[in-house]
């Protein structure tokens, strides 16, 4: 297969939805950063600010029944899988009402009814699990596919290549999406892997790969939709490398001194949220007043999430002894 340019273009309603989705993710993550600084969120916390176009496009072309699994930078993925932000924030704040009962925290978010299978703290560990999810779909004879997200740092993990081999050998319906934000913690791609074209990493297993601009919602929408169609129709894996960028450090404890302010500002000039807003206004898909109303509704969602989380109880002590399997 090949990705045809502009085969699919979002319609008016999808542009507006993408703006609302990305704005919600941006404001949610900003609030998480604020609450972390206030000591109300503990442990590790990895923000998704800057990368919103990736999951926004994928979530839009997903079909009911498809599954999602990702790494520890997972807040955005679970929200667009269908989990209400208040349950996600409650989990980050360690409350019993959280999506993982307050025991998972930022890196281990789960929502099985919405087929979101984590949130995994071990680099690359989600890839063989996602491959197993795709195996289950094929075994059960469904027409569902699995979207497995990983970072550029995970592509050097041995288990990733074992998963690639199994997926191609058994013809599994899975899309591996490499979110290449240029740094695995503080190490650039060029310093950690010999072949920097990460979409080619599956070639020895017969897996086609494609590279998309993860800062461009329209390109993400068009490319991901074509790839998903191919995987669904042919039950065979595809690798998507999406070139994106995180505006914040690797985690809340990372000052990101390994990159210059000029580099960060260069990417912010292409901010996907600003671009989508411009497209909507230029094409008269909505008015400035309409977008301000969306902004107000997002503020209300965040406010409700904070109030719900702060008023929720901590887990009962006996929860320490549940869901222990080893």
From Swiss-Prot:
CDD domains: TPP_E1_PDC_ADC_BCADC. Its EC number is 1.2.4.1. GO terms for cellular component: intracellular membrane-bounded organelle. InterPro entries: DH_E1 (IPR001017), PDH_E1_Alpha_Subunit (IPR050642), Pyrv_DH_E1_asu_subgrp-y (IPR017597), THDP-binding (IPR029061). It comes from the Bacteria. Its cofactor is thiamine diphosphate. The keyword Oxidoreductase applies. GO terms for molecular function: pyruvate dehydrogenase (acetyl-transferring) activity. This is Pyruvate dehydrogenase E1 component subunit alpha.
